[in-house]
Amino acid sequence: MELKIDTHSHTYASGHAYSTLIENARSAKENGLAMFCTTDHAESMPGAPHYWFFANQRVLPRFLEGVAILRGVEANILNTEGEIDLPLSVDPNLDWAIASFHEPVFAPSNKEAHTQALLNVIQGGRIDALGHLGNPHFDFDFHAVLHCAKEHNVAIEINNSTLKGHSRVGSVERCYEIARVGKALGVYFTTGSDAHFCQDVGKLDLASELLDSVGIDSHRVITHSPSQFLDFLELRGRGPIDELASLRQ
């Protein structure tokens, strides 16, 4: 499947990534993207930036190297109440918000606790996608969470880095099963490289392979085209981004 948007990438601001935004944009261009989301870790992760970093993304240009930039965050799920580590005041300055479990922030617990946290973060209405759900340390009720995501128009991320099998070990088959459940329920899918070095931005080959293998319709993959992605943002209640209107053509 052709994928034109990468919705999960990091700069050195995350504390354990190694490239600048401009370097990421250059790689995005080289890898054929139309746009990408910059989504550094929110402040509860060791080494991550203060929330002012995210609030100030309004100063970023809408295009670098001819590639559109979406202003985003990878927020941490903090607890079973589904709270995330970003003040509400930052939300208007963002185009895209992922919520993910990370072991240094949310200690792995049990299936019921993880499920409740995910349901609550979806229902909280602040996040657009759930990140790298395949991690076996954070088992959850696939059907309950994906059904809730479908009802609230929250996208399910297919994470290319996870599918390499080197991080979050044990995730790959779970990612395929999550995709199969999501297909049956009709959820929206997004795709992210989870790049921590610039050369990986836009490398979504394993995510594409999974989507094709499971038989996901491209109409349910919001990263298949810029117009689909921008339509999804508006479905989520985010205002139109005038500078990106030309990408709908």
Curated annotation (Swiss-Prot):
Residues that hold Zn(2+) 3 according to the record: E74, H102, H132
Residues holding Zn(2+) 2: H16, H41, H196
Co-factor: note: Binds 3 Zn(2+) ions per subunit.
Enzyme class, UniProt record, top EC level: hydrolase
UniProt-listed Enzyme Commission number(s): 3.1.3.-
Protein name: Probable phosphatase VVA0289
Keywords: Hydrolase, Metal-binding, Zinc
InterPro entries linked: Phosphatase_YcdX_put, PHP_dom, PHP_phosphatase, Pol/His_phosphatase_N, Pol/histidinol_Pase-like
Cofactor(s) essential for the protein: Zn(2+)
GO molecular function terms attached to this record: phosphatase activity; zinc ion binding
